[in-house]
Design a protein with these regions (language model features):
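Alpha-helical transmembrane segments of integral membrane proteins, especially early/N-terminal helices
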Residues: 1-13, 75-87, 162
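Generic alpha-helical transmembrane segments of integral inner-membrane proteins
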Residues: 46, 50-53, 86, 159, ...
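C-terminal TM-helix exit segments that contain a strictly Trp-centered aromatic cap at the helix terminus
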Residues: 87-91, 167-172
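Class A GPCR helix-loop hinge within the 7TM core
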Residues: 119-159
Length: 172
């Protein structure tokens, strides 16, 4: 009976919310790939953060770019990619290096990486889809495009994209 309670407590300590338990027993097989991908992400994250923040600020500070619906979607994409470079990539590096060094990854790192990944990459994918659809409308509708695709509607679409991804991630 006492052993059963102890096993239940150990299982509760090792669960990490909605995330499945990773298989750290095979860490030796992934050691080199973890090291390489961790180093690559650590090198490129600052460049990505800088580039995406410059794109976002350029659109935000320029009145002519802010008034173009397609530029607002690009700003939404730049914001999402900026968050990838400051949240997802560093947590990925921490995840892989902890896996290599300790054979275990803290639950907070796993949750930050997984939820940041789901939200940011979901937003990126949906924003790219919205950009494609907006460009299709620009080609297809010609003269009616400016009346149909407005800055206000694009902002609503961008807010809906963020809301949907955050809501769907939090439902897990």
């Amino acid at each position: 009976m006492a052993a059963n309670v102890s096993n239940d407590n150990n299982q509760l300590l090792h669960t990490c919310f909605h995330l499945p338990d990773p298989f750290f027993q095979q860490v030796q097989h992934r050691y080199q790939s973890n090291l390489i991908t961790g180093v690559i992400n650590a090198i490129f994250a600052p460049f990505s953060a800088t580039a995406n923040s410059l794109v976002f600020l350029a659109i935000l500070l320029s009145a002519s770019l802010r008034s173009a619906p397609s530029c607002l979607l690009i700003a939404c994409l730049a914001l999402s990619d900026f968050l990838v470079s400051v949240i997802v990539q560093p947590s990925y590096v921490a995840y892989r290096f902890n896996e290599n060094l300790h054979g275990y990854v803290n639950c907070a790192v796993r949750v930050l990486y997984a939820n940041g990944f789901y939200v940011c990459y979901g937003v990126s994918f949906m924003t790219l889809s919205a950009i494609s659809f907006e460009r299709y409308l620009a080609l297809r509708l010609h003269l009616r495009y400016e009346g149909l695709v407005t800055v206000r509607r694009i902002l609503l679409v961008a807010m809906l994209i963020w809301f949907l991804n955050i809501a769907l991630t939090s439902l897990q």
